[in-house]
C-alpha cells in the first residue's frame, strides 16, 4: 500500500524531565515511542528481548538507556526499574508495549505452550511492570501507565485466539487499574492500534494469508477495506498519542481505551 497521509502534529510539550520506561522498545513502534519521548526532553529507559536490536539502539542513541531482558520475568522487571531509578529517579510514565503475535491457527490446533507464551508476553508482563511501578507512583501521588492493546480486542480476529484474548484482557486490566489507582493520582489508559506499518505486520499478513490460502497482497487489501481511512497506522501515530497523554494536556484522561487505528469497522 502507498504511504498514508499525515496530519501535522505540534511538537509535544510538558514531558521534559519525565522519567519514562518503555518495554519492548528497541525496535518497531516501541523504538519510535522511546525516541519521541527522548526528543521531547524526557529521560528514557527501554528494554527489549532482542539483543541485536538493543545493540543497534545503544550505538545509535546514546541519550536513551537500553537494557536487554525479558519482562515476563520478575527479576528482569526489578532490574529494569532499579536501573531507571538509579540513573534518572522515580518513574513517571510506564509504557507496557511488550506483545507477540502468537500462533495463526484454528483453536483446536493451538498448543498449550503457545497459549501460555502469549499470556506471559502479552498480559503477565504488563501486570508485573505495573505492579512494580505503582508503589512509587502512589507515594508521589502521580504517574501514568499506558498499556498497548489492539483494535482486534474489540472485534475479534479468527485464527488469532491467544493474541485477541490477551489483548482483550489488557482492556480489563486498564479499566480496573484506572478505578483502583485514580484516587492515588495515577492515570491508566490503553492504546488500541490498528495494523502498524512495519516488518511485524508484514509477517502477520503473510502468515494469515497462507492460512487462508490467498496471497499476502490480497489479504492486506481485504484487511484495509474495513478501515475507514483505508490505511495502516504509522508508529509515529502511536507515539504522538502516548506523549500527548503524558503531557499536561492529558492530565485528566484516565480509564480510556483509545483507538489509534483509522477506525476499524470490522477486522477480517
Describe each region flagged by the PLM:
Residues 2-11, 101-104, 155, 231, ...:
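Short C-terminal tail/terminal secondary-structure segment
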Residues 135, 179-183, 251:
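Alpha-helical segment proximal to the catalytic Tyr-Lys
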Amino acid at each position: 500500500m502507498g504511504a498514508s497521509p499525515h496530519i501535522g502534529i505540534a511538537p509535544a510539550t510538558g514531558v521534559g524531565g519525565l522519567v519514562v520506561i518503555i518495554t519492548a522498545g528497541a525496535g518497531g513502534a516501541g523504538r519510535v515511542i522511546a525516541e519521541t519521548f527522548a526528543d521531547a526532553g524526557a529521560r528514557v529507559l527501554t528494554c527489549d528481548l532482542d539483543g541485536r536490536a538493543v545493540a543497534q539502539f545503544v550505538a545509535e542513541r546514546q541519550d536513551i538507556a537500553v537494557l536487554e531482558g525479558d519482562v515476563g520475568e520478575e527479576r528482569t522487571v526489578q532490574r529494569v526499574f532499579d536501573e531507571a531509578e538509579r540513573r534518572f529517579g522515580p518513574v513517571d510514565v510506564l509504557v507496557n508495549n511488550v506483545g507477540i503475535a502468537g500462533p495463526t491457527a484454528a483453536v483446536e490446533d493451538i498448543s498449550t505452550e503457545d497459549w501460555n507464551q502469549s499470556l506471559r508476553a502479552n498480559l503477565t508482563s504488563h501486570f508485573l511492570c505495573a505492579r512494580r511501578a505503582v508503589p512509587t507512583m502512589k507515594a508521589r501521588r502521580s504517574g501514568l501507565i499506558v498499556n498497548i492493546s489492539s483494535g482486534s480486542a474489540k472485534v475479534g480476529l479468527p485464527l488469532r485466539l491467544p493474541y485477541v484474548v490477551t489483548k482483550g484482557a489488557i482492556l480489563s486490566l486498564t479499566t480496573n487499574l484506572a478505578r483502583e489507582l485514580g484516587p492515588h493520582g495515577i492515570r491508566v489508559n490503553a492504546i488500541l492500534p490498528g495494523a502498524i506499518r512495519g516488518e511485524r505486520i508484514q509477517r502477520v499478513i503473510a502468515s494469515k494469508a497462507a492460512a487462508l490460502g490467498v496471497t499476502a497482497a490480497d489479504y492486506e487489501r481485504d484487511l484495509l477495506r474495513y478501515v475507514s481511512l483505508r490505511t495502516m497506522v504509522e508508529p509515529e501515530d502511536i507515539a504522538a498519542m502516548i506523549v500527548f497523554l503524558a503531557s499536561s494536556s492529558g492530565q485528566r484522561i484516565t480509564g480510556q481505551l483509545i483507538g489509534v487505528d483509522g477506525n476499524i469497522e470490522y477486522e477480517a
